[in-house]
């Protein structure tokens, strides 16, 4: 019930339309029931009495009722279809709005393909069910109730047969309905698995083809599809059992009723018109039960889809936005890490940082070096408050960042990653992502400062050239300069660089380095360094290993005081020397 209550909350803004729909539904059901009386008049007064005038009146009555029923059906169908589309759109928007605010830890334990399936497939299913199945269920319920009342008015003895049959019919509905609901949830989960798998393969299609794994991936995908089909087959089987059982029981009861009623007509205990009207109401009642049995499975699917969507909508955000009175822009651009210990939620027994302390002064350049898994990228995540440490604190200026609004904090920070993220869209859109209110002139100025204008102007449509998915139409160096232009446009006070030149050729590296030098000027900068030659200019170099800070100093100081740094320097500079001698 809580799931359905959550769904009904999305209908509250449209109460007027809901009430008009219900009025049209009740009106249409009432008109439909009146047709049974028209049928009785046609038989008793038109046929039995052989009166043309009475027949004409009865036919006119039926035609008027049919016209009213058509008008009511139009209003009912339009409104419920509109509500289905509107509510599914509102749910989709609400879920997406909540998802983009969730902490990154949520996405460690929830696959993107599954989330996409819920946003698309489940909301589409809800739209179909609200716009169709709910209407059928309500109409069938009202028709069933109204037909039962008319049956009692027409003939109590025959109604007794129908009333006895109803509980018998409801038994398979309840038994199979529970199974259908469970299997519907499993089916939707398995379909989401298929979507997740396909999305991952398509995203990494070059790697798949490079390793000639097409045949293996086809087989693996086929296994996922067949697994989803197996669950769907069980669900369909249960629904088929439900429908077959209901039809058999309903029409069995109708047959018994016809036999008793026909006998009464032969004996003169009731008129042919009364029997005709009774048959009409009985069929209406039987149709209502049959429709309910069919729709019941759809409604169970709706419950499953709603559960999956509500899980996303009510997922708790561990990094809360607070109404802080502190103006972040007035705080000094100083970062102070105090005794940090942090484990990722997906690896709670494996600390990524242990008792880590470091102070980064305003406008200074700090480089982080160390082997893979040392905790360098984790620091970037914590600075942006994607996670909160289990122990210790991080201060921006003299304020603990837990006391700051995460959005306001992130407004002060820009990141340039080793593999920059670009979105499907044109150059202008991707650079303006750093500052949505920026004018075209400001975007172009940032591109010029990032040494990106020289290649952007050569693109087919200049700044309005589409970059493709993830910027696939640009080289690595070009993508980096777009990312730097975006960071320049944001004009942050703290800059995080994840070795932005490590994967570039010499010419691209030179141009990117020029852009980075301009970007770092006058900003507190933290660099993750994979190549020590790129950070010799840093004010301080911090050596990390196993989540701990093991040394800190200048390049020359660390060569003497840190065996780990000296070993890394020897390996890298010796390799560079060998490469230089060979060329």
Predicted regions and their residues:
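Helix-loop-helix
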Residues: 51, 150-164, 238-307, 312-313
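Alpha-helical segments in transporter systems
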Residues: 16-37, 58, 62, 80-81, ...
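Transmembrane helices of ABC transporter permease
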Residues: 13, 17-28, 135-186, 257-270
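Conserved catalytic Walker-motif region of ABC-type ATPase nucleotide-binding domains
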Residues: 99, 221, 309, 337-339
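Juxtamembrane helix-loop junctions of ABC transporter transmembrane domains
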Residues: 23-24, 31-44, 65-112, 116, ...
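ABC-type nucleotide-binding domain
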Residues: 322, 329-583
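An intracellular "coupling" helix at the cytosolic face of ABC transporter transmembrane type-1 domains
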Residues: 13, 104-105, 121-130, 134, ...
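Membrane-integrated ABC transporters
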Residues: 1-31, 35, 47-61, 76-80, ...
């Amino acid at each position: 019930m809580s799931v359905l209550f959550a769904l009904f909350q999305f209908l509250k803004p449209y109460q007027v339309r809901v009430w008009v729909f219900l009025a049209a539904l009740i009106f249409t059901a009432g008109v439909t029931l009146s047709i049974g009386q028209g049928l009785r008049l046609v038989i008793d007064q038109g046929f039995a009495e052989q009166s043309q005038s009475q027949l004409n009146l009865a036919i006119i009555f039926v035609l008027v009722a049919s016209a009213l029923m058509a008008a009511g059906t139009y209003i009912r169908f339009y409104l419920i279809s509109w509500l289905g589309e509107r509510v599914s759109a509102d749910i989709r928007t609400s879920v997406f709005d909540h998802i983009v605010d969730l902490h990154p830890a949520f996405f460690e334990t929830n696959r993107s393909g599954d989330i996409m399936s819920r946003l698309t497939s489940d909301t589409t299913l809800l739209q179909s069910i609200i716009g169709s199945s709910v209407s059928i269920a309500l109409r069938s319920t009202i028709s069933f109730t109204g037909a039962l009342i008319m049956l009692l008015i027409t003939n109590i003895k025959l109604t007794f047969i129908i009333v006895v049959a109803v509980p018998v019919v409801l038994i398979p509905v309840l038994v199979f309905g529970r199974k259908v609901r469970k299997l519907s949830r499993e089916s939707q989960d398995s379909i989401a698995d298929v979507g997740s798998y396909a999305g991952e393969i398509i995203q990494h299609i070059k790697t798949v083809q490079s390793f000639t794994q097409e045949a293996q991936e086809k087989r693996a995908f086929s296994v996922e599809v067949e697994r989803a089909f197996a669950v769907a087959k069980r669900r369909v089987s249960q629904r088929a059992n439900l429908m077959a059982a209901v039809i058999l029981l309903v029409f069995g009861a109708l047959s018994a009723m016809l036999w008793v009623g026909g006998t009464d007509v032969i004996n003169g205990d009731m008129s042919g018109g009364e029997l005709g009207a009774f048959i009409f109401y009985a069929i209406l009642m039987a149709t209502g039960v049959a429709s309910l049995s069919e729709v019941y499975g759809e409604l169970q699917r709706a419950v499953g889809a709603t559960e999956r969507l509500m899980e996303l909508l009510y997922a708790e955000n561990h990094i809360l936005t607070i109404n802080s009175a502190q103006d972040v822009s007035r705080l000094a651009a100083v970062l102070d890490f105090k005794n940090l210990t942090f484990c990722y939620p997906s690896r709670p027994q494996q600390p990524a940082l242990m008792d880590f302390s470091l102070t980064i002064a305003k406008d200074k350049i700090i480089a982080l070096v160390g082997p893979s898994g040392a905790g360098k990228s984790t620091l970037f995540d914590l600075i942006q408050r994607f996670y909160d440490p289990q122990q210790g604190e991080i201060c921006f200026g003299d304020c603990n960042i837990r006391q700051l609004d995460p959005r306001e904090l992130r407004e002060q920070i820009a990141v340039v990653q080793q593999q920059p993220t670009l979105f499907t869209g044109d150059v202008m859109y991707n650079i303006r992502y750093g500052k949505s209110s920026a004018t075209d002139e400001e975007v172009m100025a940032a591109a010029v400062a990032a040494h990106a204008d020289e290649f952007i102007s050569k693109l087919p449509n200049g700044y309005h050239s589409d970059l493709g998915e993830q910027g696939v139409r640009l080289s690595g160096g070009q993508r980096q300069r777009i990312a730097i232009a975006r960071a320049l446009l944001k004009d942050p006070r703290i800059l995080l660089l994840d070795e932005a030149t490590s994967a570039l050729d010499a010419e691209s590296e030179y141009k990117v380095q020029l852009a980075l030098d301009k970007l770092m000027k006058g900003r507190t900068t933290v660099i993750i360094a994979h190549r020590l030659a790129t950070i010799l200019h840093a004010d301080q170099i911090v050596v990390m290993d196993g989540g701990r800070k093991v040394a800190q100093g200048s390049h020359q100081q660390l060569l003497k005081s840190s065996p780990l740094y000296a070993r890394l320097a020897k390996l890298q500079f010796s390799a560079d020397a060998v490469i230089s001698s060979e060329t």
